[in-house]
Amino acid sequence: MNRKPIPTRIALAAAIALLQLGAAHAQTAPATTDQSAPAQPQANDGLKLDQVVVTGTSTKLSKMKQSVSISTLDPEQIEHSGATSTAELLRLIPGVRSESSGGEGNANVTVRGVPISAGGSRYVQFQEDGLPVLLFGDIAFGTADQFVRADYNIDRLEVIRGGSASTLATNSPGGIINFISKTGEEAGGAFGLTVGANPREFRLDADYGGRLGPKTTFHVGGFQRIGEGGRPTGFNAENGGQIRANVTQQLDNGYVRLYLKALDDRTPTFLPVPVTVSNGQINTIPGIDPRTAFFITPSLARDVTLNKDGGFTTSNPHDGLRVKSTAVGAEGSFKLGDGWTVDEKFRKSVNSGRFMGLFPSDNGANGTATSFTGVLFNTSLDNFDNLFNEIKLNKALTLGDGKATVTGGLFNGVQNVAETWFWNTYKFTLNGIGAQVVNAAGAPTSAPIGDGFTTFGGCCVRSWDVQYTQLAPFVAATYEIAGLNLDASLRRDIQKASGYTVSGNATTRTWDPATQKIVNYKVSHTSYSIGANYALTRDLSLFARTSEGVSFSADRLLYGNPLDGSVPISLNKVTQTEGGAKWRSGSLNVFATLFNARTDESNFEVTTQKFTSNKYSANGLELETSWYVGSFHVAGGGTYTNAKITASNDPTTEGKKPRRQADFTWQLTPGYSIGNVDIGAAIIGTTKSFGDDQNTITMPGFTVVNPYVSYQFNPKTSIMLAANNVFNALGYTEIEGDGHAARAVNGRTWRATLKYQF
């Protein structure tokens, strides 16, 4: 079937038109404020409660005035976090559950007891500068975080939980994670050289921004790296980088900005490793350390798979997670007079890649054998291109003694999802480092013991090419009077899907036309959010909100019920109620939120080949604090979650805790400055959780400590030594339901960074 490409010419024409519109309005008046230039917080405002929020809200107000739970991280906090991936960085945010054990991508991310029933971030949208990275967060082997890299380009990270995320973005009823770029408003830049040992790593970061003219700013930055990755892989499993740039033209009535992004990166994929379970407790197998084990060794350098065209392709498993993304975009904001403003954003991205990682299909006879069997998840991300556009029209007016804002907007998106699966089966020696591929007799080889036509009973020789079109009109209204802020919003999401799926035939050893199924359906839903914030004083605000939203599924539906429009399409719905307080006294800041989240979902899980239908309920408390005293500062947070499965197509799980959901998670980031020396740490912990919905396997609680020490040679030059998981904690984040394989966070690593700022 021929797929319709996303119209690049239309995207470029829109960019040119936007620039021409901006040029027509260019004068010499002062520049207006845009999303990348928020109000500056006070020096003692550790939680940045006075900072203007632009993510998941209809009006640009400070955190203190918004009726949402939102956290921000600035470049210094990111640098001191010790995080080696986006997923690790998100563990610093209260309310966010980020399973950061998969490497640079393919992370499992959710919020507030909303379940992780498969992979990815089904209920949370990843954004770059206010537009989604991908339309769906839980595409198997192609999650949104795979296409995001944290580097010197980031001005700040905004993370909203619950709130109006359900109505001001698509597929985001749980929250929004927005990476906001520097735009050159502050002139300067930096070079950073990072060297890692055990495992080996070399990375160069650079950025620079400033003025091209009185009303024109720019910023450009990126990174390049090579090394083993987060574990001792024995080869350069990490190899690639990105460059991002933007230029902004300020106008008398707004601004116009153009964006560019080019990402080409290879990183290792860390999947579960063989373990055993005894009396509900996880045990390691001699020779396999879950913190360092990696089975894609030099003995496995070639894998032959069926491609989407029916031929065979040879790929190198050493490439691990390979992603390519080229994106161009534009945004503008214009004051039209008489209280009217219009905001426009669009981005066209060309995305592709390949996911390769080894998944154990057994544990070597409970560790008593000399080898185990593993399936090489070799999945081609054939086409993940997308085009997103959002336009908003705002009207500010006076109503009585108060101020009101009415917003109407339209989001339009096109997302291609095309993948090809072909998973060969290999046998490996039971060695966590330096494992050898062997044949059925145990002799060294490089060949599989079974091809994709027989793996998992031949279920998973699959290819599909589906295009999803999203249309979402939305409206929002706010009213502010005497310290009271009220807001309400509605969103109507309409999704159309068209394309096909096909499966392989073991006899003909190619795609079987008889298995081809047409995808052609339409699904829609209306979401709402209502909130209020009341400022009792300048330093104390109370807020409350109720909201409901949905996340539409993409590939998770493809091999279940018919998708030709003949049967209803299942939705994943989240309803949240929350209330809390924001308070500060001197340099002490506190942000506390009580929440209730109810989830109704259907799901397909790749590794178990099971369809599930569950309902969940979670009550809890988020707490975020910050305190400065002299040269000492500390920020921290904690999340208590009481979650349970309230209904299920498997009645044995009803009333049980959702798998991998801990009762309590916490973060602590203390720091101390003395002269030219800064010392500190990012400390992240969790209590125990269950690895399965039947609550028979316990994953112990653990704490990861990431300390750092930095020395400032002069105002421009510094060096920092940092460790990740310095105490080498063994922290499991997931386990298969039968207990044969589990995944853990990486073991201890060290890095040193020499940085020059100018």
Where are the model-predicted features located?
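Structural signature of Gram-negative outer-membrane beta-barrels, strongest in the C-terminal barrel
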Residues: 384, 403-415, 456, 462-599, ...
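Short strand-turn segments of transmembrane beta-barrel domains in outer membranes
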Residues: 176, 180-211, 221-233, 682
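Gram-negative outer-membrane beta-barrel transporters
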Residues: 27-28, 587-600, 605, 611-694, ...
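Face-selective signature of the C-terminal outer-membrane beta-barrel domain
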Residues: 324-352, 376-504, 535, 584
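N-terminal Sec signal peptide and the immediately downstream disordered periplasmic leader
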Residues: 1-83, 87-92, 328, 616, ...
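Short acidic/polar hinge/loop motifs at secondary-structure boundaries
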Residues: 132-161
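Acidic/polar loop-and-plug regions of large Gram-negative outer-membrane beta-barrel proteins
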Residues: 248-250, 255-327, 354-382, 432-461, ...
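Extracytoplasmic beta-strand/coil segments of soluble accessory domains associated
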Residues: 55, 62, 70, 87-132
